[in-house]
């Protein structure tokens, strides 16, 4: 199998110790623009009908598989998963091409990406998922997979090709997109993570079919893209100092432990948590649940060469999903800013290296001087590269 790959730098770059840009987010009005919930005990929300924005392919557009003379041909679908530390953000992020912030107006490069995909013959769906204070992990993962099943089950209504669905997202959305790509319908066989869980328990943990309205449909996607996504929540704490940045998130919001149930390493006993040592736990969440989440919430574990798996597909895709040297792993494009002080770029480099070792089609684009969520990660050149990569990897031929 041919492996795609580009590094927009000489090898894997390193950066000098850099002043931590904790003010970057505050100056941009990041915290003013989002109302962050006050965390106490969780306020669970049962998954019902998720919210989505749907953008059909532009009339007369063409892709690598269809031409402008075939307007009725089903379109490939890009499912976009918003970011926001798993605790805020919205499916409306792709609507307006002008972004209005407390500091003024600027182009919404994510919406411009959506428009470029439409013009290239893709349909685009931007979805919501439950926040971490509404559903502990893997609730958000279940919601994204349910969205894939929903669109696949309603292929005729939306005019999409169910064999050509890709998923992509930024930051927290990139983390979820990578997990969707590399755990989809895999658990009916052996465990992706090599744990001792039974196949049914493992399957339900990653798929959430018990609460699904479309349990007979596959959650597998043909390809994926991650923009500055987290691939290993355990090492992000050490990656930041290695990259020359402070240990914690700006305005430390505890995004990781609030998502998974506790800090890492997981405290031995919820009743003896030592806050002075930085230990935290979400009220009402048992330590055993947090331990399981910390064992399974990392995309890197699903793609490492030593975790070679025979991923079983529910749908017999005629695309890049075929079994082969990759062990069935899903093609993935990664985009990351080298100056990202929130999620260091090493988080994407490791996934890229693991996929290359397994001969899985993959591309890594490292953006010089770009911060977390930087609009330069969605430049027209990168969007075109993303289109080319996804067109190749979701091809139905």
What are these regions (language model features)?
Residues 2-149, 153-397:
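Alpha/beta-hydrolase superfamily serine-hydrolase fold, recognizing
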């Amino acid at each position: 199998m041919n492996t795609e790959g580009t590094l927009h730098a000489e090898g894997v770059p390193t950066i000098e110790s850099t002043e931590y840009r904790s003010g970057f987010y505050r100056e941009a009005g990041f915290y003013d623009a989002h109302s962050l919930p006050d965390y106490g005990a969780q306020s669970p929300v049962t998954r019902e009908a998720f919210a989505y924005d749907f953008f059909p392919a532009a009339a007369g557009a063409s892709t690598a598989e269809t031409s402008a003379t075939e307007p009725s041909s089903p379109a490939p679908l890009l499912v976009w998963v918003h970011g926001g530390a798993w605790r805020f953000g919205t499916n409306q992020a792709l609507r307006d091409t002008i972004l209005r912030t407390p500091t003024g107006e600027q182009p919404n490069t994510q919406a411009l990406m959506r428009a470029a995909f439409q013009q290239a013959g893709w349909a685009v769906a931007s979805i919501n998922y439950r926040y971490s204070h509404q559903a502990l992990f893997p609730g958000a993962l279940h919601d994204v997979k349910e969205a894939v099943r929903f669109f696949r089950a309603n292929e005729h209504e939306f005019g999409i090709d169910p064999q050509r669905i890709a998923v992509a997202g930024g930051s927290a959305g990139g983390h979820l997109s990578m997990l969707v790509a590399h755990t989809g319908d895999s658990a009916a066989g052996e465990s992706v993570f090599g744990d001792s869980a039974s196949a049914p328990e493992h399957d339900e943990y990653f798929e959430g079919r018990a609460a699904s309205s479309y349990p007979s449909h596959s959650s597998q996607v043909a390809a994926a893209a991650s923009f500055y996504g987290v691939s290993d929540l355990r090492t992000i704490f050490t990656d930041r100092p290695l990259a020359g940045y402070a240990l914690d998130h700006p305005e430390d919001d505890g995004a990781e432990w609030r998502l998974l149930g506790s800090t890492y390493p997981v405290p031995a006993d919820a009743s003896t948590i030592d806050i002075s040592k930085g230990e935290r736990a979400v009220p009402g969440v048992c330590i055993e649940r947090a331990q399981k989440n910390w064992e399974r919430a990392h995309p890197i574990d699903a793609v490492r060469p030593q975790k070679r798996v025979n991923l079983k597909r529910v749908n017999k895709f005629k695309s890049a999903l075929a079994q082969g040297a990759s062990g069935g792993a899903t093609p993935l494009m990664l985009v990351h800013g080298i100056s990202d002080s929130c999620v260091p770029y090493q988080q994407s480099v490791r996934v890229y290296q693991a996929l290359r070792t397994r001969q899985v089609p993959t591309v890594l684009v490292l953006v010089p001087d770009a911060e977390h969520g930087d609009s330069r990660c969605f430049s027209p050149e990168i969007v075109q590269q993303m289109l080319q990569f996804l067109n190749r990897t979701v091809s139905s031929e």
